[in-house]
Swiss-Prot record:
Name of the coding gene: PSAG
Membrane topology value: Multi-pass membrane protein
Function: Not yet known.
Name of the featured protein: Photosystem I reaction center subunit V, chloroplastic
Keyword RNA-binding: no
Superkingdom as given in the UniProt entry: Eukaryota
GO cellular component terms given for this protein: chloroplast; chloroplast envelope; chloroplast membrane; chloroplast photosystem I; chloroplast thylakoid; chloroplast thylakoid membrane; nucleus; thylakoid
One Gene Ontology term from the biological process aspect of the record: protein stabilization
Organism: Arabidopsis thaliana
Keyword entries, A-Z: Chloroplast, Membrane, Photosynthesis, Photosystem I, Plastid, Transit peptide, Transmembrane, Transmembrane helix
Keyword flag Signal: no
Transit peptide limits: 1-60
Coiled coil (UniProt feature): none
Lineage: Eukaryota, Viridiplantae, Streptophyta, Embryophyta, Tracheophyta
Subcellular location: Plastid, Chloroplast membrane
Family the entry assigns: Belongs to the PsaG/PsaK family.
C-alpha cells in the first residue's frame, strides 16, 4: 500500500530482453509460429488507415467437433425417444426371414438362431448397442453433410 497514485496510473512497460523459449512465449498464426515478446517483424502488419473495406465479409466458422457431437446427440435422442416404437413395430410386422413357410432356424439352420446376449441392455425400453451404432452413424452422416455443404459456400438461408 506504499505505492503512489502516479505509479498506478503510469503506462506499463514490458521488457523485451527475455528470449528464452517457453510455451507461453510462442503463438501461432496458421502453421507459422509467432514469437510473443520478441521482434515485431514476426507479427502480421496491420494497416491503420481510416478507410473501410466494404468487400470484407465476416463469417462464423462451424467447429467440426461441436457439429458432430450435437448432430450425433440429437440423432441418438430422436432414435431413443421418438422413433423407437415405430422402428420396433415395423420389425415385428416384418418377422423373421422364411423359406418355404418356415424360418431358417426351423428349417434346420442352427446358425440362424438370434444372438440374444448382443441385444440385451439395461435400458428400460431396450435401446441396445445395435441401436446406438445405427443412430450414431446417422448422426455422423448428417454432421458431415452439414460440414461439407457449409465449407463449400452453400448457404441454404433457412431463416431469411
Amino acid at each position: 500500500m506504499a505505492t503512489s497514485a502516479s505509479a498506478l496510473l503510469s503506462p506499463t512497460t514490458f521488457s523485451t530482453a527475455i528470449s528464452h523459449k517457453n510455451p507461453n512465449s510462442i503463438s501461432f498464426h496458421g502453421l507459422r509460429p509467432l514469437r510473443l515478446g520478441g521482434s515485431s517483424s514476426a507479427l502480421p502488419k496491420l494497416s491503420t488507415t481510416g478507410r473501410k473495406s466494404s468487400s470484407a465479409v465476416v463469417r462464423a466458422e462451424l467447429s467440426p467437433s461441436i457439429v458432430i457431437s450435437l448432430s450425433t446427440g440429437l440423432s441418438l435422442f430422436l432414435g431413443r425417444f421418438v422413433f423407437f416404437n415405430f422402428q420396433r413395430e415395423n420389425v415385428a410386422k416384418q418377422g423373421l426371414p422364411e423359406q418355404n413357410g418356415k424360418t431358417h432356424f426351423e428349417a434346420g439352420d442352427d446358425r440362424a438362431k438370434e444372438y440374444v446376449s448382443l441385444l440385451k441392455s439395461n435400458d428400460p425400453i431396450g435401446f441396445n448397442i445395435v441401436d446406438v451404432l445405427a443412430w450414431g452413424s446417422i448422426g455422423h452422416i448428417v454432421a458431415y453433410y452439414i460440414l461439407a455443404t457449409s465449407s463449400n459456400g452453400y448457404d441454404p438461408s433457412f431463416f431469411g
